[in-house]
Structure formats: structure tokens, C-alpha cells
């Protein structure tokens, strides 16, 4: 395929036009009074959304040179979303500001490589300053504020996420799903849940709900297939003497063993229920061990020298309650094994840090959540499909912001943290001796004003005036774009996760620096649209003759 090539200033100007086209579309959504963007879809109704990264992903420019610039900013938004889960619009605004200031200096003769070094030094200084200013999330009120601000000042969503975090702890899993109803609801599954149900409907104890429920059961765990009832006799005798229900989790239970358990249950001799072990291979063994730690039992496995024939009540786990449907099993354990569970979570967390696989990371995080306390599901409802998608994106952003805040703490929101941190660059700039490095630091210092200016502009205020009023104020003092007041933002609950601010700055500076140092731009030449096929002469119908009517000449 043929290539189009641009050199020198032309290449950088084309990239800047692409950056501006995308950033100008995205930045109108920034802040509590940010507007929406309507996205036309090839199929279905248009979407009206307020989510920066979703808007950025949809934009493709006609000019291939400009489109390359837009694609680079898409990468900024996507990277920030991946790392911090929120802050994509802030990252886009910062990238645009750094590119604009940087290219002005490059056009004036500054060395882009040296400018880049100055930008990198400035960002490193700011990252340290953000970490120093961050305050840990102390209570539920802080979580509620962060979630509400990120969801577009939706207090209902803020409260829902705060409730979810309180119920499943910071290690729990919180997911967002679309609901079939109009209401948005929180559903919490306490205990450990896995996707395996009872092996026979004859185990059911509640016929109306078609579930098995037992209080205070014992739990037998094995990685073996059980086919003969003789394998279970020693354990069943111990359980019968104890007078407690028994949950059996095994690779499989079939034939005589399953039939005997069903008959004993039907006759009221012994309350039992059998389910297959979740997952496969090594992951199955790991999850069985998780259940063993949670319930204080042991996995009966030849790998550790245990067999069913030798098993007794000492290897059985204990739970407060079990609820089993045809598809899922939920085990709610007590706090007796809290120390062992904490040690197991720490062990899984070490594995999480070592893995490079996204799939493994997701599965390990799920295991931590199930051990730590459970899973919460926020079911999003809305009157229309368009509103549902917009609301779901906002709630996902709020959830990601909350996780980031718990991880690295919070700083004052509303764009004021970046503005006030510009003063941290003064001493760095004074310590540098190379003029263009100083310029690089100055570029970042000016760009730090951009998010606050845009938030104010979107709220109908004059951004430049707001920036000047706040420049020399206390660190926590800022502009509340929702009310138009200047106030202590921390006291007002307007907070940003430090991780989001840090990631937005780092990702924006990284891509913007690459644009500044670009000298040649090579893109694919667009292929011409294929011409429409020419209209034929309908040769198959020449003369429109009608067979059998040739003798009908004109009189």
C-alpha cells in the first residue's frame, strides 16, 4: 500500500490538528456541569454519553495525518482508564495543553529532545508531590463523596457504592450489570460463591425456591471422583452421629454413591447435598484449598496422603450456612478461621503481583474477593436504552474512582490539586541549567492550569479568572463548579483519587512528549472508494420479445 509522508513542522501541525479535534470533542464533558456528546451508531439508536474514553474511541478523522494525532490521544485516554479506571477526560485535556505549549516552543527553535527531558523531570517531581499530599480514605463519607463526584454528583450512586464497599470490604468484588427494571439496586452476595449447583434435584429442601439450605453444616472436600458409597461410609457414620447436614464437594459423584445419598436424604436418615468442585485442573485444586481454609477443613487428596477411606470428622470443614441452587453454591463461614484466611489472601496477593497474565490476574482477584467477604452487584436501571448505557458508564467510572481512592488516597478535586502543585516546580526549574529543560518544566506548569480552566468554562464561568483567583490560595481551597462558590473542597467533599490525578498526568505527558519529538509522519494512503457498477443495458431483456406472439404484427 502506498504511503503519505509529511516532514518537519508540517508533520507536527497535522498531529496537533488531530489532537485538538479529539480533545475538543471530549473536554466538553469535564466537571459537574460538563455537557453530553451524542454518538451516532451504525445500528440502533444514537448514544448520548458523558464518558471521555468512550467518546474518544468513537472518533476517526477523515485526514489520515490528523487521524494519527487523534489516535495518540485515544491511547492517553485508554491507558489512564486501564491504570486508574477514571480521569480520561483530564488526561486528554492535559495532553492537549502540553502539545499546544510544547509545539509553540519547538516552532520557536527549542530542542524537542531537551524539552522532553524537562517535561519528564517535571512529571517525576509532581508524582512525588501528589503522593505527599494524598490523604488516606478514612471513612464511608469520603467514599460516598468520591463516588458521587465521579458519577456526576449523583448522591444516590455515591451512597450505593459506599454501602457496597462497606459490605464486601475493599478486597471484595463489586460489579455493574444492566437491570431489567427501571430502578438501580444493590445486591450483595455474602460468603463464598461458585458456579456449581446440586447434582440432583432430590437434594432440594425448599420446593418453592428450588434451593438447598442448611444451617451449621459440615463440609467434605476432595479432588477425587466418588462412585462407590463404601468410600463415604466412615465419614457418613461420623456425620450421622453428629446430627448435622453434610455438603460434599468433589470432582464428581455418580452411580451408587449419588443414588445412596439421595435415598438417605429422602428417608430422612441423613441430610446431604453433593456438588461438583468448581473450575478445572490446578485452579480447581487452588479453589478447593481456599474453601478448606475458609471453613477450617482439609482437602482429601492423594497429593497430601489422604484418602476417603481414612477420612473422619476431623478433616471436615464447618460453615454457618449453605445455599445451593441448580447453578450456584454459596458458603457463609464464621470468623473462627480469620487468621488463616488472612494468610491465604496474602499468599494469593503475592501470586497476583507476580503474574503477567490479565486472565490470571482477574481470577486471582476473584479468589481474594470470595475469601475476603463476598460479591456486590449494582444492577443499573433506566427508562430507555440510551439513558441506561450512559448511567452504567457513570457508575463504572464512580466505582473505578473509589477503588483508586482506597488504593492511593485522595486529594482536593475540581482541578485545583494540579493548579496548586505548579508551585512545586519552581525549585526544580531554578535547579536546572539547560534553558530548554527549564522550558520543558514551564510547559508542564502552564498545562496544569488546563483542567481547572476547562471545568470552569463548562460551568459557564471565565476559566482564566477562576485560575487567577485560586493561584495563591491554600492547597485545599478551590472552585466548586456545581455551586459557583470558592471554598474548602475537602470540607465540601469534592475529592479526586490521587491515583487518577497521577495517572492522567503521567499518561498525558508521555504521549505529548512523543508528539513533540516527531519529525516525520508516515501514514497509509486512503484507498479510493470503489466506483458503483455502471448501469447495464438489461441485455437479457433485449427487444422485450414475448415468445409465442411473433405473429402479432402491426396491421
Curated annotation (Swiss-Prot):
PANTHER family for the chain: 60 KDA HEAT SHOCK PROTEIN, MITOCHONDRIAL
EC supergroup of this enzyme: isomerase
Protein name in UniProt: Chaperonin GroEL 2
Keyword Magnesium: no
Gene this protein is translated from: groEL2
Sorted UniProt keywords: ATP-binding, Chaperone, Cytoplasm, Isomerase, Nucleotide-binding
One example of a Gene Ontology biological process annotation: protein refolding
InterPro entries: Chaperonin_Cpn60_CS, Cpn60/GroEL, Cpn60/GroEL/TCP-1, GroEL-like_apical_dom_sf, GROEL-like_equatorial_sf, TCP-1-like_intermed_sf
UniProt EC number: 5.6.1.7
Family: Belongs to the chaperonin (HSP60) family.
Top-level lineage group: Bacteria
HAMAP family: CH60
Signal peptide limits: none
Keyword Ribonucleoprotein: no
Entry function: Together with its co-chaperonin GroES, plays an essential role in assisting protein folding. The GroEL-GroES system forms a nano-cage that allows encapsulation of the non-native substrate proteins and provides a physical environment optimized to promote and accelerate protein folding.
Major subcellular location class: cytoplasm
Subunit structure, as described in the record: Forms a cylinder of 14 subunits composed of two heptameric rings stacked back-to-back. Interacts with the co-chaperonin GroES.
An annotated GO cellular component: cytoplasm
Catalytic activity: ATP + H2O + a folded polypeptide = ADP + phosphate + an unfolded polypeptide
Binding-site residues for ATP, renumbered to this chain: 29-32, 86-90, 414, 480-482, 496
CDD domains the record matches: GroEL
Organism: Synechococcus sp. (strain ATCC 27144 / PCC 6301 / SAUG 1402/1) (Anacystis nidulans)
Pfam families: Cpn60_TCP1
Record localization: Cytoplasm
GO MF: ATP binding; ATP-dependent protein folding chaperone; isomerase activity; unfolded protein binding
